[in-house]
Amino acid sequence: MPPKKKKLAAIIKLQISAGQANPAPPVGPALGQHGVNIMEFCKAYNAATESQRGDVVPVEISVFEDRSFDFKLKTPPAAKLLLKAAGVQKGSGEPHKTKVGKVSMDQIREIAQTKMVDLNANDLDQASKIIAGTARSMGLTVEG
């Protein structure tokens, strides 16, 4: 007889710096209210994201009724990747008036390649257009 499927109790979505998960907010309260072992998650997440230190890595945590959990790592947010590519700290407060930096089409294509698994696009050109739109709405000029 096949093993019984665990019943899903909740799905928690968080954005945590890679390799730096700890029981302090936002991780602790989000997991604590579902009865998950917080330290166990922190150790597993930090081990899984050790190679991506410095980036913010979104994670989707599936919590089951027996309080066990499973998590899926996503790719870093497009906005963070664009800021890093442009070499600026943050986007513009007035994106369509004040431009804060420039990104080339090659950089956008590279980011689109990275984000392809999480994006709702069929090919690289469509993914590039999505990323270029994000760049424009952050006050970055797209060249090329």
Swiss-Prot record:
Q: Which Gene3D superfamilies match?
A: Ribosomal protein L11, C-terminal domain, Ribosomal protein L11/L12, N-terminal domain
Q: Which CDD domains has this protein been placed in?
A: Ribosomal_L11
Listed SMART domains: RL11 (SM00649)
Q: Which UniProt keywords apply?
A: Methylation, Ribonucleoprotein, Ribosomal protein, RNA-binding, rRNA-binding
UniProt entry tagged with the keyword Ribosomal protein: yes
Q: Which domain of life is it from?
A: Bacteria
Q: Please, one GO biological process term?
A: translation
Q: How is it modified after translation?
A: One or more lysine residues are methylated.
Which positions carry the signal peptide feature in this UniProt record? Answer: none
Q: How does it assemble?
A: Part of the ribosomal stalk of the 50S ribosomal subunit. Interacts with L10 and the large rRNA to form the base of the stalk. L10 forms an elongated spine to which L12 dimers bind in a sequential fashion forming a multimeric L10(L12)X complex.
UniProt lists the family membership as follows: Belongs to the universal ribosomal protein uL11 family.
What role does this protein play?
Answer: Forms part of the ribosomal stalk which helps the ribosome interact with GTP-bound translation factors.
Q: What is this protein called?
A: Large ribosomal subunit protein uL11
**Taxonomic path:** Bacteria, Bacillati, Actinomycetota, Actinomycetes, Pseudonocardiales
- Point out the gene that encodes the protein: rplK
